[in-house]
């Protein structure tokens, strides 16, 4: 029996949007099983200076419910690499806006643990108006923070 090709990607996934779905479909197309690491609330606060709008467990559940995703797990509070070391993926897909690691640094860090997955940077967002959480929040503010709005 041939070993399943495991693909891992990671992100915050706060306010799911079409861009998230695009990267998940792409990641799944590269292998047999897609496991998504969802960033912890505390980690997001450290990186972005604010907690996510949607709590971590709800974000994990929503991501896991998406068709391309086989499993979603929460990231580690201690070591960003911990879930990857446990999962031992064949491929890691980085999003276009992920800056925690660049491809080379990630390869070097994982090599210290004798892990040598293929690392792929996703660059293929379709041109849709709402492929980022920030764009969605800006549009909500534009639409609902004017005086003419009647709710």
Curated annotation (Swiss-Prot):
Cofactor: a divalent metal cation
Record Pfam families: CTP_transf_like
SUPFAM superfamilies: Nucleotidylyl transferase
Keywords annotated in UniProt: ATP-binding, FAD, Flavoprotein, FMN, Nucleotide-binding, Nucleotidyltransferase, Transferase
Catalytic activity: FMN + ATP + H(+) = FAD + diphosphate
Enzyme Commission number: 2.7.7.2
Pathway(s): Cofactor biosynthesis; FAD biosynthesis; FAD from FMN: step 1/1
InterPro entries the UniProt entry points to: Archaeal_FAD_synthase, Cyt_trans-like, FAD_synth_RibL, Rossmann-like_a/b/a_fold
Residues that bind ATP: 12-13, 17-20, 97, 125
UniProt KW Flavoprotein keyword: yes
Gene Ontology molecular functions: ATP binding; FMN adenylyltransferase activity
Family matches, as Gene3D superfamilies: HUPs
CDD domains: cytidylyltransferase
GO BP term, pick one: FMN metabolic process
Family assignment from sequence similarity: Belongs to the archaeal FAD synthase family.
Quaternary data: Homodimer.
HAMAP family registered for this protein in UniProt: FAD_synth_arch
Purpose of the protein: Catalyzes the transfer of the AMP portion of ATP to flavin mononucleotide (FMN) to produce flavin adenine dinucleotide (FAD) coenzyme.
Protein name: FAD synthase
Organism annotation: Methanocaldococcus sp. (strain FS406-22)
């Amino acid at each position: 029996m041939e070993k399943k090709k495991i693909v891992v990607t990671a992100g915050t996934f706060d306010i799911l949007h079409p861009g998230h779905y695009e990267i998940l479909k792409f990641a799944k197309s590269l292998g047999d099983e897609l496991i998504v690491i969802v960033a912890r609330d505390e980690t997001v606060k450290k990186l972005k200076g604010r907690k996510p709008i949607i709590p971590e467990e709800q974000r994990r559940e929503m991501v896991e419910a998406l068709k391309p995703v086989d499993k979603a797990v929460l990231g580690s509070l201690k070591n960003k690499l911990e879930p990857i070391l446990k999962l031992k993926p064949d491929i890691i897909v980085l999003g276009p806006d992920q800056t925690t690691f660049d491809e080379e640094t990630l390869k070097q860090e994982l090599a210290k643990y004798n892990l040598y997955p293929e690392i792929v940077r996703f660059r293929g967002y379709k041109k849709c108006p709402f492929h980022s959480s920030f764009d969605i929040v800006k549009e909500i503010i534009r639409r609902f923070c004017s005086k003419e709005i009647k709710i």
